[in-house]
């Protein structure tokens, strides 16, 4: 078999975090009864006229600045003409000729430490389509226009990626950057971030591109990785068998791990683009652009360096924390309250991530940091109570599980469940003396040189005091009394 190379470019659609749609005042809230967030504009009624949501321009330009794009200061909208039941106007308002952002790039770091630059061809603004719901039992399809007119940006990369790993690194960098901006929550499972994979293969060393396919319906990074590997293998098998790869759009079925052809892949001329006559061109002034640049937040790489320098965190901790804007918010707010950065980091990377994994296992889908609802104040309170020896570590973990699940009040939970640590030496001494008297064999083992036997005695003391004893004091008393 010849040596083949995969060539990948991505079209990433990101739903912007505006409260209303791109050209009307309807809500963009996810969920809701079908067709409850609609009006004549977003359902394409004759005579209705679009009015541009300024926040969409702000978010699109901000993402462009964050990805090193050139901002088109005079841009406009075009109509992309096609018929489909979820498209009530029979055209989509998009940008072809003068997109808002061009010629950007993001730098990614691969698992072996290699740095790679992925170029961005353009970022353009557009409106989303509605959603078709197929009822196989009744044999009918329904359409929900709640999503119709929701603002999107489409980030079109150059075909610079050569592996699934590079694709995931690029998408992770994009998602983190956009979340830091607050431009979108980028939840793949809810469709607020969607990636279409354009993929072809060619002999390694060739400068000619192969015939590309576009793969859709990719709802997680894991699905994207599986789809890339499957499509690469499919195209290589076709070429090796002397058959042609057809330029087409394919739909990925992640349960069965295969794709099937949906339709032939269209080119721009198939959509008969022309300037939208109902929308005036957009002018982005130098002053407005300077204002947007000044509002750019501290992004992952800068924040990571600061965490290492300012808080003395190990590089690994700083890398994990800054992967998610939500983690950084919890870390910074909790640290500001309790002034224990390493302990806050340990709780996020330990107990928080453990509970997130358990939640993922229960639901069968990845539980993301953005779904966390507990307050940083609660975490800081737990850490402070442990530091003051008012509760022990076991109680702290119990409390945090309830904070994670229900955001309970920490003080109230401690009081209600009697979790305050016993630090009274007299009470502890009496219990320790009884445990020593009740466990002569463990005492003999300890005195005979089996130092680990003291662990059993500590455990028995903790059990006798219902887990409320100060374990450090218990250990010290045992060593004193067993001399």
From Swiss-Prot:
Gene Ontology biological process terms in this record: glutaminyl-tRNAGln biosynthesis via transamidation; translation
Sample GO molecular function, one term: glutaminyl-tRNA synthase (glutamine-hydrolyzing) activity
Keywords, sorted A to Z: ATP-binding, Ligase, Nucleotide-binding, Protein biosynthesis
EC identifiers of the protein: 6.3.5.-
Family matches, as SMART domains: GatB_Yqey
Catalyses which reaction(s): L-glutamyl-tRNA(Gln) + L-glutamine + ATP + H2O = L-glutaminyl-tRNA(Gln) + L-glutamate + ADP + phosphate + H(+); L-aspartyl-tRNA(Asn) + L-glutamine + ATP + H2O = L-asparaginyl-tRNA(Asn) + L-glutamate + ADP + phosphate + 2 H(+)
Pfam families reported for this sequence: GatB_N (PF02934), GatB_Yqey (PF02637)
Top enzyme class: ligase
SUPFAM superfamilies: GatB/YqeY motif (SSF89095), Glutamine synthetase/guanido kinase (SSF55931)
Subunit structure of this chain's protein: Heterotrimer of A, B and C subunits.
PANTHER family xrefs: GLUTAMYL-TRNA GLN AMIDOTRANSFERASE SUBUNIT B MITOCHONDRIAL AND PROKARYOTIC PET112-RELATED, GLUTAMYL-TRNA(GLN) AMIDOTRANSFERASE SUBUNIT B, MITOCHONDRIAL
Functional description taken from the UniProt entry: Allows the formation of correctly charged Asn-tRNA(Asn) or Gln-tRNA(Gln) through the transamidation of misacylated Asp-tRNA(Asn) or Glu-tRNA(Gln) in organisms which lack either or both of asparaginyl-tRNA or glutaminyl-tRNA synthetases. The reaction takes place in the presence of glutamine and ATP through an activated phospho-Asp-tRNA(Asn) or phospho-Glu-tRNA(Gln).
Sequence similarity: Belongs to the GatB/GatE family. GatB subfamily.
The name this protein goes by in its record: Aspartyl/glutamyl-tRNA(Asn/Gln) amidotransferase subunit B
């Amino acid at each position: 078999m010849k040596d083949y190379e995969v060539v990948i470019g991505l079209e990433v659609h990101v739903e912007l975090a505006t409260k209303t749609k791109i050209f009307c005042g309807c809500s963009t809230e996810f969920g809701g009864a079908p067709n409850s967030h609609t009006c004549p504009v977003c359902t394409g009624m004759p005579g209705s006229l679009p009015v541009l949501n300024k926040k969409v321009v702000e978010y699109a330009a901000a993402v462009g600045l964050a990805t090193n794009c050139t901002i088109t200061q005079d841009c406009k909208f075009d109509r992309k003409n096609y018929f489909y039941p979820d498209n009530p106007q029979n055209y989509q308002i998009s940008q072809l000729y003068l997109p808002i952002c061009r010629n950007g790039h993001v730098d990614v770091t691969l698992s072996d430490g290699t740095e790679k630059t992925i170029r961005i061809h353009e970022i353009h603004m557009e409106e989303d389509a509605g959603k078709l719901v197929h009822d196989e039992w009744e044999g009918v399809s329904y359409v929900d226009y709640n999503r119709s007119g929701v603002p999107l940006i489409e980030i079109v990369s150059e075909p610079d990626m050569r592996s699934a790993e590079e694709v995931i690194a690029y998408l992770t960098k994009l998602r983190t950057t956009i979340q830091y901006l607050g431009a979108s929550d980028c939840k793949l499972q809810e469709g607020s971030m969607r990636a279409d994979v354009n993929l072809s293969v060619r002999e390694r060393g060739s400068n000619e591109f192969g015939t590309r396919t576009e793969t859709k319906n990719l709802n997680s990074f894991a699905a994207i990785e599986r789809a890339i590997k499957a499509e690469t293998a499919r195209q290589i098998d076709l070429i090796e068998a002397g058959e042609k790869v057809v330029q087409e759009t394919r739909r990925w079925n992640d349960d069965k791990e295969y794709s099937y052809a949906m339709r032939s892949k269209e080119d721009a001329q198939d959509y008969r683009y022309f300037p939208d006559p109902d929308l005036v061109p957009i002018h982005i002034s130098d002053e407005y652009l300077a204002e947007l640049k000044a509002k750019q937040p501290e992004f992952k790489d800068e924040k990571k360096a600061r965490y290492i320098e300012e808080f003395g965190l190990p590089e690994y901790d700083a890398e994990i924390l800054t992967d998610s804007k939500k983690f950084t918010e919890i870390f910074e707010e909790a640290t500001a309250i309790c002034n224990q950065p390493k302990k806050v980091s340990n709780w996020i990377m330990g107990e928080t991530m453990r509970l997130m994994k358990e939640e993922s296992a229960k639901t069968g889908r990845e539980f993301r940091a953005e779904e966390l609802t507990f307050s940083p104040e609660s975490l800081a309170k737990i850490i402070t109570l442990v530091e003051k020896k008012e509760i022990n570590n076991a109680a702290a973990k119990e409390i945090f599980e309830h904070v994670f699940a229900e955001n309970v009040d920490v003080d109230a939970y401690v009081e209600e469940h009697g979790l305050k640590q016993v630090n009274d030496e007299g009470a502890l001494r009496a219990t320790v003396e009884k445990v020593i008297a009740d466990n002569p064999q463990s005492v003999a083992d300890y005195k005979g040189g089996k130092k680990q036997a003291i662990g059993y005695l500590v455990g028995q003391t903790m059990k006798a005091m219902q887990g409320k004893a100060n374990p450090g004091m218990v250990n010290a008393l045992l060593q004193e009394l067993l001399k």
